[in-house]
Amino acid sequence: MSAEVPEAASAEEQKEMEDKVTSPEKAEEAKLKARYPHLGQKPGGSDFLRKRLQKGQKYFDSGDYNMAKAKMKNKQLPAAAPDKTEVTGDHIPTPQDLPQRKPSLVASKLAG
């Protein structure tokens, strides 16, 4: 057992030496982390931004807001009952079917 402990220690030392030798990038990274500790944090923005994002859906412009508002109204209002028996579109009007226009009381300035 005493022989295993030095081997484990030497293996750890070898890993540390390899890390130091093979990765100067890690050394530079450690220097930068020491100099700028706040840059290592996860991105998330300010507290204000996080709070605004947690609030929920926000609208891009007034059109989006009005469309969402109209959808909510359509869901809340029940469908209108067909009380009227009037049918639209069963007769196509012709010029003879239309009533005559009444002449205007005010003379047109274009007529002269």
UniProtKB/Swiss-Prot annotation:
Biased composition (Low complexity): 1-11
Tissue distribution of the protein: Whereas isoform ARPP-19 is ubiquitously expressed, isoform ARPP-16 is found only in selected brain neurons.
Similarity-based family: Belongs to the endosulfine family.
Record text on subunit structure and interactions: Interacts (when phosphorylated at Ser-62) with PPP2R2D. Interacts with SNCA. Interacts with PPP2R2A; the interaction is direct and this interaction inhibits PP2A activity.
UniProt GO BP: cell division; G2/M transition of mitotic cell cycle; mitotic cell cycle; positive regulation of gluconeogenesis; positive regulation of Ras protein signal transduction
Region described as Disordered: 1-49, 74-112
Annotated keywords: Acetylation, Cell cycle, Cell division, Cytoplasm, Mitosis, Phosphoprotein, Protein phosphatase inhibitor
Protein name: cAMP-regulated phosphoprotein 19
Modified residues (N6-acetyllysine): 109
Residues found modified as N-acetylserine: 2
Gene that encodes the chain: Arpp19
GO cellular component, as recorded: cytoplasm; cytosol; dendrite; synapse
